[in-house]
């Protein structure tokens, strides 16, 4: 049986220059430490949809062409840089991130040629249905 090994990372919801992991490393640095012979995909998840396009373009400049890129953002309120208690309480979802608005982000990501799209925390079935309808 063949298994697909994936590398998944969350991105800081706010950054000044290059996108960073929540642990503080720039994406370029983190991706440079991956053995791409052992994975099939790099995924960015559970972060604001607004930061994903920059993460995609940054990754595309670093990873081999045969590695898939995927994105599934969340609908939570942004986590501030340096906030250490991000999971200490239930976070509110963004009311303005409607299925239609999320679909606009998905279209942007697909124009950047990502292979995998979906949704994370706060992205519901109605959001996913819009993505599925786009593919029809």
Locate the predicted segments by residue.
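Domain-level signal for soluble alpha/beta catalytic cores
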Residues: 1-136
């Amino acid at each position: 049986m063949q298994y697909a090994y994936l590398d998944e990372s969350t991105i800081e919801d706010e950054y000044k220059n290059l996108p960073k992991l929540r642990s503080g490393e720039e994406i370029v640095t983190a991706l440079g430490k991956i053995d791409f012979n052992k994975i099939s995909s790099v995924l960015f998840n559970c972060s604001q949809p607004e930061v994903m396009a920059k993460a995609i373009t940054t990754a595309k400049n670093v990873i081999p062409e045969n590695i898939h890129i995927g994105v599934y953002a969340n609908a939570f309120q942004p986590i501030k840089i340096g906030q250490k208690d991000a999971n200490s309480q239930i976070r509110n979802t963004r009311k303005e991130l409607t299925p239609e608005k999320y679909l606009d982000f998905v279209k942007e990501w697909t124009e950047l040629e990502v292979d995998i799209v979906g949704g994370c925390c706060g992205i519901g079935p109605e959001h996913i249905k819009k993505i599925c309808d786009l593919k029809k």
